[in-house]
Amino acid sequence: SGNRHKGTMWWQWAQRAAAILFIPLLVTLMLQYWGGNEQELAQIMEVKTNPGMMTSLTLPDGTLVYLNSESTLSYPSRFDNDTRNVTLQGEAYFEVAKNPEKKFIVSTSHQSQIEVLGTHFNVEAYEKEDRISATLVEGKIGFIYKSNDVSKKVLMDPGQKLVYDSKDNKVQLYATSGESEIAWKEGKIIFRNTPLEEGLRMLEKRYNVEFIIKNDRLKGDSFTGTFTNQRLERILEYFQLSSQIRWRYLDSPDMKDEKSKIEIY
């Protein structure tokens, strides 16, 4: 009876596998029938995250990607060319599979790119923002940007964070442990002497809200702390205890607004 049970399980698995494989196989056979020996073209895949949500995925070459809130990653179903090209709008953490023969290139907004062979790094490049940042955890990357229509490359070492301002066309490098920049993929928010504006930007992405700072004097405040799966109100209460900050939810006159607005005063 044990062999019969194993045989039944195998047959059920085979049926499921056949169901999964059937459509791709049918498409391949049709392409071969109509297109002779022409190879099937790689499809462009796109993964999007909703506000306040995160996801992870594995690319065809084995590269692991964590995608942050309101982000989009586009990539081919196969890396057939000499380079592995993906396009990012938003924020992602990459653990790139090593392949010395094929560079891994991340295209971002403002005609900039990040070029790697095999490494771990974080990229923040939201289309609506003028700022792009890259934090290198392991390996080596090159940040490529255009200045007066000339391509320039900045090489980075582990423990460095690059910030590119597309308005001023300036690049700055900072030393960092990377702890704060990549905490989001573990569901954490880490502030390390983080300025108020930067901290609020992090909270906007995580909780799908919009902050309005009414008191400019508060912009000089900075905060240190670690939060794991905390309610937004709990974090704002911590801000309130640590400084003179006060906050309140605003009623939106536009019912189409998807984001709650919070005034900092």
Task: Give residue spans per PLM region.
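A residue-level detector for the "anchor" residue at the start of short, highly conserved motifs
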Residues: G2-Y265
